[in-house]
């Protein structure tokens, strides 16, 4: 009798386990294929280009190329957001405050996140043997750790890392142009309209990198509006 009871108990346990295994989490019926965030970014008919396609187009001798930093290779909004709250919550005057730039250029980039697309672009150019320069519109400060964080975040070998160039931002002029000319750049990557305009002024190849939608730098620019190439999936 005891053996029969144990057998029946084991059978009941097995059946209960099978029913658990067969149970499925409820999912609604699919009514369309859906879309990812990356696919949404590609829906407009602009000149999309991938990192691989850029590399394929660059057959030949190494060259000098340049990158903007904020929203191009680094998602640095946390530092800028903190600066706005601390120095000018109601406007953007903090961007003219030397105290903010001392903080941003020396401490707050530790909260910046390297963009995957930025890393892929930089590594592609380094593999080609290109010389890479970083030209930012940030104001210059006596000391800076931006170079350190860019090098570490984008995994650039020390002997390939050039010090970050602080072009500054003056109303009515594009300070990046002279630096781009002096370093004989052939390509410049940036998220802002001014980056593409600077490249066009020098008749070099300006390639747009998408600014993340949650960037502190608003409003978002209209990528591709000048007919420039736009890097696919470069918002992150």
Swiss-Prot record:
| Gene3D superfamilies registered for this protein in UniProt | HAD superfamily/HAD-like (3.40.50.1000)
Organism, as annotated: Morganella morganii (Proteus morganii)
Record localization = Periplasm
Q: How is its activity regulated?
A: Activated by ethanol. Also activated by Co(2+), Zn(2+) and glycerol. Inhibited by EDTA, inorganic phosphate, nucleosides and Ca(2+). Unaffected by fluoride and tartrate.
Q: Which residues bind substrate?
A: 136-137, 176
Q: What is its main location?
A: periplasm
The protein depicted here goes by the name Class B acid phosphatase
Q: Which UniProt keywords apply?
A: Hydrolase, Magnesium, Metal-binding, Periplasm, Signal
- Give the annotated active site: 68 (nucleophile), 70 (proton donor)
Name the catalysed reactions. a phosphate monoester + H2O = an alcohol + phosphate
Q: Which cofactor does it need?
A: Mg(2+)
In short, the EC number is 3.1.3.2
Q: Write the signal peptide boundaries.
A: 1-23
Where, by residue number, does Mg(2+) bind? 68, 70, 191
Question: Gene for this protein?
Answer: aphA
- Return the InterPro entries for the record: Acid_phosphat_B-like (IPR005519), HAD-like_sf (IPR036412), HAD-SF_ppase_IIIB_AphA (IPR010025), HAD_sf (IPR023214)
Q: So which domain of life are we looking at?
A: Bacteria
Which Gene Ontology molecular-function terms are recorded? acid phosphatase activity; metal ion binding
Q: Which family does it belong to?
A: Belongs to the class B bacterial acid phosphatase family.
Query: What is the free-text note on the cofactor?
Result: Binds 1 Mg(2+) ion per subunit.
Top enzyme category: hydrolase
Output the Gene Ontology cellular-component terms: outer membrane-bounded periplasmic space
Characterize the pH dependence: Optimum pH is about 6 using pNPP as substrate. Retains more than 50% of maximal activity in the pH range 4-7.
